[in-house]
Amino acid sequence: MNGETGRWIGGVALILAPLVWFAGLLLRHLVLKDFTPEQVAWFDEQPFAAPGQLAAYAANPGLVTAAYSVFLLGAILLLPAFLMLAKIVAEKAPALAGWGFLLLALGLFARVYFAGVDLAAFELVDKLGLEQATRLVMDDYVDLSYGLWRIPVTASVGQYAGGLLLAIGAFRAGTFGTGRALLFLWPCTLWMGVLKESEFLSVVTAVALGLALVPLGVRVLTGRRPVDQKSRALSW
């Protein structure tokens, strides 16, 4: 992320990534909108959200495909956004920035794996029908979610630890005050896994991420250094 090109890539990513992430979570939140309250209540009673998500795909494959695709695009765009944030933080807190970004990147890689399993499950609905596809997915849901040698599920933990480290680093470096550090940390606690439901609170976490990253992206693009928050106990 060095030089003029790196600054532009990083700045655009800081602005665009949380917006696309928000759009993906919002669309995923809407995939159950056409079901009756009784149907939604039945989905909620299941141990996992997968049956509801597969039923949503069977009912409206275009919407569900768009929702999951935009969500994946947001996850991919977050990689350069987090890299730019880590680069800024590294000037004053290099260890926290480096480890925070590395762990967050592992979490994003895990999301790509989960997206692949999501796609395979939707393909099963197309080929076998909803009932048989749901049975096959639920019979092996835990193994599908954990992945080979449990590498994906282990990597997904990086999101939580990495978000905490980078938030602390951003606060100590003065890049974020306590307000934006907490706003950044909150979406880093978002669910991980296969065929997960986006609840309203999930959408709100994306708004929090935008409030944390978009102003920083604007400053990066305009060539202004982030305001030093002086690591005060209460600051933006």
Segments and roles (model prediction):
Residues 1-236:
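Hydrophobic, aromatic-enriched alpha-helical segments typical of multi-pass transmembrane helices
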